[in-house]
């Protein structure tokens, strides 16, 4: 579904920026990581954490409007109010937890984990009349050697023509394609 001239754009990033890599790896490495020593306490704690992770409901622990920025990272953003200029891009930062991992074995026998998300992003008037957006937007896939538990989504709406001044709602439905679970976020915003 595409309405009007408003275009959704979705960016999913995990382990992409050098600054995020080292922090992420410290949480994501499993027992098969090549190191000079193994840490049985870490492995036991990680195994216990993943058992709890598997019981979590898929939902965002953070879901806020953010300023567009060249700096993207897990927990790295500059918060934006819900008041926008008519020609401003509307960007939501969401940090989900409780998503699934699908184990995949490559032809060479290498074990990887797939994380896969899609999103519906619909801008409406306050009365629910759709103005623009899209559905079933590929939000990205991540293939990793580890069951990553930290990632973020930047869900953006851009538009060709300035939005009329007024009050709106943005409805986000994010689906974890591995588990089939979805979470919904509705954000009010004002264009001045």
Per-segment meaning from a language model:
Residues 1-30:
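Secretory targeting signatures
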């Amino acid at each position: 579904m595409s309405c009007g001239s408003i275009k959704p754009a979705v960016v999913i990033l995990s382990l992409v920026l050098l600054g995020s890599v080292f922090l992420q790896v410290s949480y994501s490495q499993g027992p098969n990581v090549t190191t000079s020593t193994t840490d049985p306490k870490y492995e036991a704690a990680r195994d216990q954490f993943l058992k709890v992770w598997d019981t979590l409901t898929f939902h965002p622990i953070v879901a806020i409007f953010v300023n567009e920025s060249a700096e993207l990272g897990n927990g790295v953003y500059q918060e934006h109010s819900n008041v926008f200029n008519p020609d401003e891009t509307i960007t939501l930062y969401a940090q989900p937890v409780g998503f699934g991992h699908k184990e995949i074995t490559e032809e060479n026998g290498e074990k990887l984990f797939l994380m896969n998300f899609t999103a519906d992003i619909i801008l409406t008037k306050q009365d629910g009349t759709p103005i623009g957006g899209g559905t079933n937007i590929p939000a990205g896939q991540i293939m990793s050697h580890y069951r990553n538990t930290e990632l973020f989504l930047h869900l953006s709406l851009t538009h060709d023509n300035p939005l009329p001044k007024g009050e709106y709602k943005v409805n986000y439905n994010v689906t974890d394609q591995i588990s089939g679970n979805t979470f919904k976020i509705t954000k009010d915003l004002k264009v001045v």
